[in-house]
């Protein structure tokens, strides 16, 4: 059902076509689009505008779903449903592709199958809340091509990177080797990532700044060692905050910083994280492996509020009280 609530009760027109019902008025207002089939969902993704909501009925929606429609900072577009509303993809591609589709909220649904779960390109201010993403060949959620000010929170991501190439990151920010991808100020909050993630739980690329990784639970039991994935979190961007996370089951270290391009991988702050390295089989077995520390030109701060169980130690740089 497609419903336009009336601002003025002057005129009501009801249209029925293809299972969609619309109520309209001379005064424009937000639209709620009720969908229950993949065809209806694809149609809705092409027609929504600022303030509109797409509400998914429980069921399976098979296909690759994409949109270029954009909301605004004051009038967002919402795609919502329960965890029993499942977007499933066969034969590759993205489950949900927000291409230039800024100011969306994606809430509650499940995405599975295909190459990647949720992909954002040049999509500013996207919020992903309470979704489940699993069963993918590659990464779960990817903020790319300067998708700034995004949020992924309260979500569960597991069983990614099933093709074994080490490209199954849970959350991926930016683009490897591309300093023009300024997917800045992405917030990764209160998610459960893993098990079965065939890459870092979170990978923050050079060219991005201000990523916040807070309150997450990491399980690295899916790490493969391919493409150097041997930690829960890999930070190659600048000025990241990594705080109040809990990690178990890694293959070498908990968190790492790297300089892949000159001037990047600097300014990370690690605070109040809890690391369990009790079953870590790696050579380093450090909670925080800081590979690029330079006090003046490329600082990293590891606070004493971080704790580690098992392994060979907290970090390889001086700890800040």
Task: List each model region and its residues.
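Secretory targeting and sorting signals
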Residues: 1-29
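Extracellular beta-strand/beta-solenoid scaffold signature
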Residues: 66-67, 90-97, 113-119, 135-144, ...
């Amino acid at each position: 059902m497609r419903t336009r609530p009336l601002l003025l009760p002057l005129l009501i027109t009801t249209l029925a076509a293809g299972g969609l019902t619309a109520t309209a008025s001379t005064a424009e207002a937000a639209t709620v689009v009720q969908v229950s089939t993949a065809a209806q969902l694809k149609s809705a993704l092409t027609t929504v505008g600022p303030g509109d909501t797409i509400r998914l009925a429980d069921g399976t929606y098979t296909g690759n779903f994409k949109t270029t429609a954009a909301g605004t900072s004051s009038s967002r577009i919402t795609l919502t449903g329960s965890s029993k509303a499942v977007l499933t993809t066969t034969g590759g591609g993205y489950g949900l592709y927000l291409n230039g589709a800024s100011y969306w909220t994606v809430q509650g649904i499940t995405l599975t199958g295909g190459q990647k779960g949720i992909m954002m390109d040049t999509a500013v201010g996207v919020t992903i809340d309470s979704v489940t993403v699993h069963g993918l060949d590659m990464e779960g959620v990817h903020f790319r091509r300067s998708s700034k000010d995004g949020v992924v929170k309260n979500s569960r991501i597991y069983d990614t990177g099933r093709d074994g190439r080490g490209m199954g990151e849970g959350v991926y920010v930016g683009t490897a080797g591309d300093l023009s991808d300024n997917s800045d100020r992405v917030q990764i909050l209160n998610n459960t990532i893993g098990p079965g993630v065939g890459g870092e739980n979170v990978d923050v690329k050079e060219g991005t700044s201000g990523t916040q990784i807070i309150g997450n639970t990491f399980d690295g039991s899916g790490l493969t060692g391919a493409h150097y994935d041997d930690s829960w979190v890999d930070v190659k961007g600048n000025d990241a905050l990594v705080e109040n996370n809990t990690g178990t089951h890694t293959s070498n270290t908990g968190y790492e910083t790297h300089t892949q391009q000159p001037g990047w991988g600097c300014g990370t702050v690690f605070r109040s994280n809890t690391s369990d390295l009790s079953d870590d089989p790696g050579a380093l077995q450090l909670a925080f492996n800081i590979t690029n520390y330079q006090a003046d030109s490329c600082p990293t701060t590891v606070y004493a509020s971080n704790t580690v169980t098992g392994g060979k130690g907290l970090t390889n740089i001086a700890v800040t009280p």
